[in-house]
Regions:
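Transmembrane alpha-helix termini and helix-breaking/packing motifs in multi-pass membrane transporters
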Residues: 75-82, 105-107, 164-185
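Short amphipathic helix-loop junctions that connect adjacent transmembrane helices
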Residues: 39-55, 250-272
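Hydrophobic core of transmembrane alpha-helices in multi-pass small-molecule transporters
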Residues: 28, 101-130
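Central cavity-lining transmembrane alpha-helices of secondary-active solute carriers
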Residues: 57-80
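Juxtamembrane intracellular "pre-TM" segments in multi-pass secondary transporters
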Residues: 1-16, 206-237
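Glycine-rich segments within core transmembrane alpha-helices of 12-TM secondary carriers
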Residues: 63-70, 148-175
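Cytoplasmic helix-loop-helix junction between adjacent transmembrane helices
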Residues: 122-158
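Symmetry-related core transmembrane helices of the 12-TM Major Facilitator Superfamily/SLC fold
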Residues: 93-102, 182-200
Length: 273
């Protein structure tokens, strides 16, 4: 009952479309969708594209570039509105890009790795754009409803955790039933819900002078650079970069062994009886 009362308070104080947006983006797309995509992409690279672990690792890191440049998407959502809206058009754009990229991967036979990589990058771009957009919505709601800010973060974490738990629990089942390409087709559903969020989201339309957009964009970049050159900021960023860059990641090699028909336990679509 406390959980229901807590959720009801969020719905009453903010807006139901905001809560739906958080659940869709954090729970269904990033939680469930990421878990399903992670397992499906591993098998897609090995069983469909027939790539070696070293090749797969490189391609997957390239495909994640849209997530690396998330600050750029954030600048666009804050500074460049469409038809007076800063959030709704970006949810719609992210949904359309994600749907098309997932269906392209799902429906094409013998897709060239270059086209597959572009499709994966497009899908990640859709996810990254939606992520920064919903974060902007949360930041706005946290300012207007300061007492509910911790509860909003709890909603984000809870949605993501539950979605990921369900996604990883069912990913093997879906992979067995419909294969890696079928999984990509299934992943178009979270992006369709993302598109629906863009249509339904409650957002006030604002008057915008588009002639000021370049100046605002440049000012935002300069403020960002001013922040980054502070020692207490760039030092922490440099430490995090080095810690990630020097950390060995043997996931693709381990996955190759796990799915090998001779040396490993053969957990593979390509070798199942």
């Amino acid at each position: 009952m406390n959980a229901i009362r807590w959720l009801g308070e969020l719905l009453e104080e903010t807006h139901w479309s905001f809560v739906v947006a958080v659940v869709v983006i954090y729970g269904i797309n990033q939680g469930f969708g990421y878990a399903l995509a992670k397992v499906g992409t591993d098998y897609y690279m090995k069983d469909v594209q027939k790539l070696q672990p070293s090749e797969s690792q490189v391609y997957l890191q390239i495909a994640r570039i849209p997530w690396v440049i998330k600050p750029i998407w954030g600048l666009f959502t804050d500074i460049v509105p469409f038809f007076g809206y800063h959030r709704r058009p970006y949810f719609i754009l992210a949904g359309i890009v994600g749907i098309l990229s997932m269906l392209f991967l799902s429906l094409h036979e013998k897709l060239h790795i270059g086209l597959a990589l572009l499709s994966l990058m497009a899908g990640n771009a859709g996810g990254a754009i939606a992520d920064v957009t919903v974060d902007a919505c949360i930041a706005h709601q946290s300012v207007t409803h300061r007492s509910l800010a911790p509860h909003m973060q709890s909603l984000c974490s809870m949605s993501s955790s539950i979605g990921a738990l369900i996604g990883y629990s069912l990913s093997g089942v879906f992979l067995h039933l419909i294969g890696p390409k079928g999984v990509y087709g299934l992943l178009s559903i979270p992006y369709a819900l993302m598109l629906l969020v863009g249509i339904l989201l409650d957002e006030q339309r604002a008057l915008t002078d588009y002639t000021q957009v370049p100046k605002k964009f440049w000012d935002a970049i300069m403020r960002m650079l001013t922040t980054l050159i502070r020692q207490d900021v760039w030092g922490q960023c440099f430490y995090m970069f080095i810690s990630f860059a020097l950390s060995l990641n043997i996931h693709e090699g381990l996955f190759k062994w796990e799915t090998d028909s001779k040396a490993g336990p053969s957990f593979s679509q390509g070798t199942k009886n």
